[in-house]
């Protein structure tokens, strides 16, 4: 049984530049005290392991490959990335990935962000679930 969880969603269209952080919107569901939404970040406030599930709809502004990557404390989480290639600008693509991150002991915290790379895009949906296990 998990101690804490948060479900954040942003369905407002947002223009995200290459290297930009995707705005997470608002918390739809939350329980416990180990995970919190702070602006465009999910904060992990207790030591332990957390699962992270991310789903994104993005429409690249130019043809190319759009990539979304999870960052923890400013560092890309290995394997927590999804990419899709489009041949026509404006075609929406679905990106999703799952990951697990760890917050160490001794007062450490985690700060999770989702960063867009590859090609600038209009993001019309992002949903993120973070669960302390």
Residue locations for each model-derived region?
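Extracellular jelly-roll beta-sandwich "head" domains, especially the C-terminal globular C1q domain
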Residues: 1-133
């Amino acid at each position: 049984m998990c101690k804490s969880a948060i479900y954040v969603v942003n369905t407002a269209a947002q223009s995200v530049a290459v290297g930009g952080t995707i705005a997470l919107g608002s918390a739809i569901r939350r329980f416990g005290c180990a995970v919190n939404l702070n602006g465009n970040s999910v904060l992990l406030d207790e030591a332990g392991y957390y699962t992270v599930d991310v789903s994104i709809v993005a429409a690249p502004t130019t043809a190319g490959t759009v990539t979304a990557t999870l960052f923890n404390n400013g560092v890309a989480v290995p394997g927590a990335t999804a990419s899709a290639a489009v041949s026509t600008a404006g075609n929406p693509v679905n990106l999703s990935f799952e990951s697990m991150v760890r917050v160490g002991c001794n007062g450490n915290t985690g700060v999770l962000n989702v960063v867009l790379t590859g090609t600038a895009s209009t993001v019309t949906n992002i949903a993120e679930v973070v669960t302390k296990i």
